């Protein structure tokens, strides 16, 4: 092994472990639903491979950061429920409707903006003090 090959970073993604971890978490739930967050290309692991693995494990609810990520995920998982963290913007209404994506409403203004378009379902973010958005 050359010095250069030892210094090259490498990531090994074990899809079997992702599936096992999902199934373990799911087994601990009662009267609850487990969802997966796949923003930023599944945190750099590869959205297609991770999404398909989780879907085969039984996951059908996903969260992504942006509308573009949601559209990409819709191509991979046509029947999944997909939420978009970055909220609702009326100029993107057509895409939310076409791709059956659900915005997470992050402010009173976004709720007001969404009301005329409320034929698409949305989620509401409640600030619990974690300051994650």
Where are these regions (language model features)?
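Active-site-proximal beta-alpha core segment in soluble small-molecule metabolic enzymes
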Residues: 2-5, 9-13, 17-19, 30-133
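Histidine/acidic residue-rich metal-binding segments in metalloenzymes
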Residues: 22
């Amino acid at each position: 092994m050359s010095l250069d090959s030892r210094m090259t970073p490498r990531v090994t993604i074990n899809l079997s472990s992702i599936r096992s971890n999902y199934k373990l978490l799911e087994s601990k739930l009662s009267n609850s639903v487990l969802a997966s967050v796949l923003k930023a290309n599944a945190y750099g692991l590869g959205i297609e491979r991770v999404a398909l693995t989780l879907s085969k494990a039984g996951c059908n609810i996903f969260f992504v950061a942006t509308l573009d990520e949601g559209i990409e995920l819709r191509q991979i998982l046509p029947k999944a429920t997909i939420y978009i963290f970055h909220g609702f913007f009326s100029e993107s209404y057509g895409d939310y409707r076409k791709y059956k994506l659900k915005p997470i409403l992050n402010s009173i203004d976004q709720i007001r903006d969404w009301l005329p378009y409320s034929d698409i379902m949305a989620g509401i973010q409640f600030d619990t003090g974690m300051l994650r958005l």
